[in-house]
A protein has these predicted regions:
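Alpha/propeptide regions of enzymes that mature by internal proteolysis
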Residues: 5-16, 21, 25, 31-34, ...
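Short acidic loop-to-helix transition motifs that present clustered carboxylates
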Residues: 44-47, 155, 174-181
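Acidic beta-strand-loop-alpha-helix segment within the catalytic core
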Residues: 92-173, 235
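Oxyanion/phosphate-interacting regions
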Residues: 183-235
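Flexible, acidic active-site loops/lids enriched in D/E/S/T/G that coordinate Mg2+ and/or position polar
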Residues: 18-98
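Short acidic, glycine/serine/threonine-rich loops at helix termini
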Residues: 50-52, 83-86, 104-107, 158-164, ...
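Short glycine/serine/threonine-rich phosphate/pyrophosphate-binding segments
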Residues: 75-84, 89-91, 157, 178-182, ...
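General beta-strand structural signal in soluble alpha/beta enzymes
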Residues: 38-42, 71-73, 82-84, 103-104, ...
Length: 235
């Protein structure tokens, strides 16, 4: 997938780049010895031609002895960044035992992520200021030296305002909070905070766990219809 869309960097057409990644990832599964089920994918069956939620893939379709897994995929995260040759586009695949990945609906998720040192020290149950001061204390930094990555969206304005009142170094990103969370875990930043996409949140959780970091997510509904859909999916 990465090679396929990488050849289209700078092409100016994000849909073309995304389509190349999707087709390459889907084709690759034909030769992988698993029975995979898409938990997080390109959308509902009626909205995505392949890698749709619930699609079953892999050589395990014809061989019941092969392991059954759930997968969360984003064949090309930050499609526009690839199309215009900007940083932080990635191809993502998370694999877990069958039944262990959250089938997150198309809604928002409030997220917080950071390095392993912050285990049990940061939480969505705390206020933004409490998380900032806790992280600063554990990481032995002045609050003003903390770098916090936040998606630049209206829904995050109150968090951004609070951090700027504390003189935190706030890095606003236009897209790509999966990479943002990985940067926070790896030390290029100190925290990722804010509301983003729920399906990407599941992938982020898997990535952060693999990097031995800290992640917490909570579904966030800005409209009742999204909550109704989530309740239907998660029953």
């Amino acid at each position: 997938a990465a090679i396929a869309c990488g050849k289209l960097r700078g092409c100016g057409d994000k849909n073309k780049a995304d389509d190349a990644a999707v087709k390459a990832m889907r084709k690759a599964f034909d030769s992988i010895p698993v029975h995979a089920r898409v938990a997080i994918g390109e959308g509902e069956m009626d909205k995505a031609p392949m890698l749709y939620i619930g699609e079953e893939l892999g050589k395990g379709l014809l061989d019941s002895s092969l392991p059954q897994v759930d997968i969360a995929v984003d064949p090309l995260e930050c499609t526009s960044h690839c199309a215009f040759d900007l940083p932080n586009s990635i191809c993502v695949l998370a694999v877990a035992p069958r039944g262990t990945l959250l089938h997150a609906p198309e809604c928002y998720m409030d997220k917080i992520a950071g390095p392993s040192a912050l285990m049990n020290k940061i939480s969505l149950g705390l206020s933004v200021e409490e998380n900032i001061r806790s992280a600063a204390a554990i990481l032995k930094k002045p609050v003003q030296e903390l770098k916090v990555i936040v998606l630049d969206r209206p829904r995050n304005e109150s968090k951004i305002r609070t951090m700027r009142q504390l003189d935190v170094n706030v890095e606003l990103i236009q897209n790509g909070d999966i990479v943002g969370a990985m940067r926070a875990v790896n030390g290029d930043a100190d925290l990722l905070l804010g509301i983003g996409s729920a399906p990407e949140g599941v992938i982020t959780a898997a990535a952060v766990k693999g990097l031995n970091g800290v992640f917490e997510g909570k579904l966030y509904f800005h409209e009742q219809s999204y909550q109704d859909r989530a309740e239907e999916i998660l029953q």
